[in-house]
Amino acid sequence: GIITDFALNDACSAGTGSFLEELCNRFSDYFNLKNLNNTALAAEYGIILGQHCSVFISDVIEKAIFSGCTKESLAVGLFDSVIVNYLNRVKKNRTIGKKIFCQGMPFSMEALACSVARQTGCEIIIPNNPGTIGALGASLLARRSLINDKSKYLNIDLVFNVDYLAKDNFLCKSNIGCSKPGIR
């Protein structure tokens, strides 16, 4: 297919994987990233955690743990939170088709795909190696560009000898007032 639209989360720069990993690390007595998928799939129900960043959702999780919520229902809530955030902050008012193709390493966890299906009612397609699809797409686009324009060439030394030119600090500028520091 051909990309016809693109959008990023305008409130938070954390990706799904880093969001889940950070929360599992913060609540390591309760969650384990390696088992988070199976924990969520074993749940009888999920709870609503909202669409907060990991800083604010931690408070919600602490209150839920204190009130006796099971780790299984909280795991479902984590996955659902990711998708609610996506639907409200990235998809926004855009229409989606009947099938959703999901890529990125977090989609190697079936529970995340289940959350997408549950919240959208769409058929979900997950490739065998969801974490490599973005790199594959980028390489195919680069190949097409090089094939179509013979004046371009790929200097392999530039590929293997990459230096990071800059690293800067930033403040989160989410609408809910996160103002937490980060590094990019």
What are these regions (language model features)?
Residues 7-15, 77-79, 101-107, 125-135:
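Active-site nucleophile and cofactor-binding loops and adjacent substrate-binding regions
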